[in-house]
């Protein structure tokens, strides 16, 4: 007896679910206690609210930091941050993925503090095999100190996407055919730190940290990681993958951010690269 169409539909749904599960493993953090280690700064780094909230603080003696217990090789990382309020000049809140060693890979969000009323600068960078110098900087279109906002990294063999509140702000494409290394072989941990960088962070170091405002504190919540299978990622064509990650609306949002809020792009800095822009900038 032939199976019913309903039976067939159920079978295909089960097959589809199985395929999705085999190519993507979601890890929703139960708590910061389970997923992260406080690595430096003593009691300046704290986990509270039953493991649902984490804070880092900076004073004149020390900053603080944490790292993930787990390493990741391709995936989507989401974290909600509320940055240092008030006069945060001279401070840097760094949130990034990194491997270890002299040829490490790294994907950076760095939030450069500023005087009260002036906007934060979001500094992004990508290191491949120990080499960075791929900076793009942005103003944010909101006050990142008043509420929590979500900062995300999507990392696959085809490209890396930086997102703020699910709006893409930067796409770094795999340009290995042009001889540009791409992070794809070294698993990376999640790191974050709050530290003093008043020799460069605010107006090139002209504005120093006002220690009378210390301690400076940033807050974290709602961490989530979704791991992608490298095999399934590589099987997608570049164009197909691009369409899956950035639909027409997302591409418009990316252009909007880059037109109105980007304040530095290494791919436009001809003075910095008088012998010619890096190969990935010429695509």
UniProtKB/Swiss-Prot annotation:
| Residue positions binding xyloglucan | 110, 123-125, 133-135, 199-200, 204, 272
Q: What CDD domains would the database entry show?
A: GH16_XET
Fetch the InterPro entries from UniProt: Beta-glucanase/XTH (IPR044791), Beta_glucanase (IPR008264), ConA-like_dom_sf (IPR013320), GH16 (IPR000757), GH16_AS (IPR008263), XET_C (IPR010713), XTH (IPR016455)
Question: What one GO molecular function would you report for this record?
Answer: hydrolase activity, hydrolyzing O-glycosyl compounds
Induction summary: Up-regulated by brassinosteroids, at a post-transcriptional level.
Kindly list the residue ranges recorded as spanning the membrane. Answer: none
**Residues annotated as site: Important for catalytic activity:** 108
Q: What is its EC number?
A: 2.4.1.207
Alphabetized, the UniProt keywords read: Apoplast, Cell wall, Disulfide bond, Glycoprotein, Glycosidase, Hydrolase, Secreted, Signal, Transferase
Q: Which domain of life is it from?
A: Eukaryota
Q: What class of enzyme is it?
A: transferase
Biological processes, Gene Ontology terms: cell wall biogenesis; xyloglucan metabolic process
Active site per the UniProt annotation: 106 (nucleophile), 110 (proton donor)
What broad class describes the main subcellular location of this protein? secreted
Against SUPFAM superfamilies, the record matches this protein to:
Concanavalin A-like lectins/glucanases (SSF49899)
Q: List the disulfide bonds.
A: 267-281
GH16 domain: from which residue to which, for each copy? 31-220
The name on file for this protein is Xyloglucan endotransglucosylase/hydrolase 2
């Amino acid at each position: 007896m032939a199976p019913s169409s309903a039976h067939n539909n159920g079978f295909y749904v089960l097959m589809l679910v199985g395929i999705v599960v085999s190519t993507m493993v979601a890890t929703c953090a139960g708590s910061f206690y389970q997923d992260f280690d406080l690595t430096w700064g003593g009691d300046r780094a704290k986990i509270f609210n039953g493991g649902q909230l984490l804070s880092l603080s900076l004073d004149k003696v020390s900053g603080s930091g944490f790292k993930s217990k787990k390493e990741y090789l391709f995936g989507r990382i989401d974290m909600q941050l509320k940055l240092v309020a008030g006069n945060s000049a001279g401070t840097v809140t760094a949130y990034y993925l990194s491997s270890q060693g002299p040829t490490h890979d790294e994907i950076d969000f760095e939030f450069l503090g500023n005087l009260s009323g002036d906007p934060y600068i979001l500094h992004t960078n990508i290191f491949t095999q120990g080499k960075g110098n791929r900076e793009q900087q942005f103003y944010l279109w909101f006050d990142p100190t008043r509420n929590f906002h979500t900062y995300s990294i999507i990392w696959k063999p085809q490209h890396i996407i930086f997102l703020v509140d699910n709006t893409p702000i930067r796409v770094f494409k795999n340009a290995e055919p042009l001889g540009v290394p791409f992070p794809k072989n070294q698993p990376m941990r999640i790191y974050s730190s709050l530290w003093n960088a008043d020799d460069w962070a605010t107006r090139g170091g002209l504005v120093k940290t006002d220690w009378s405002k210390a301690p400076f504190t940033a807050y974290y919540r709602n961490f989530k990681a979704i791991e992608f299978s490298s095999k399934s990622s590589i099987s997608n064509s570049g164009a197909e993958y691009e369409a899956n990650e950035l639909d027409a609306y997302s591409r418009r949002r990316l252009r909007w951010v880059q037109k109105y809020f980007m304040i530095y792009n290494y791919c436009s800095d001809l003075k910095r690269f008088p012998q010619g822009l890096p190969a990935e900038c010429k695509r």
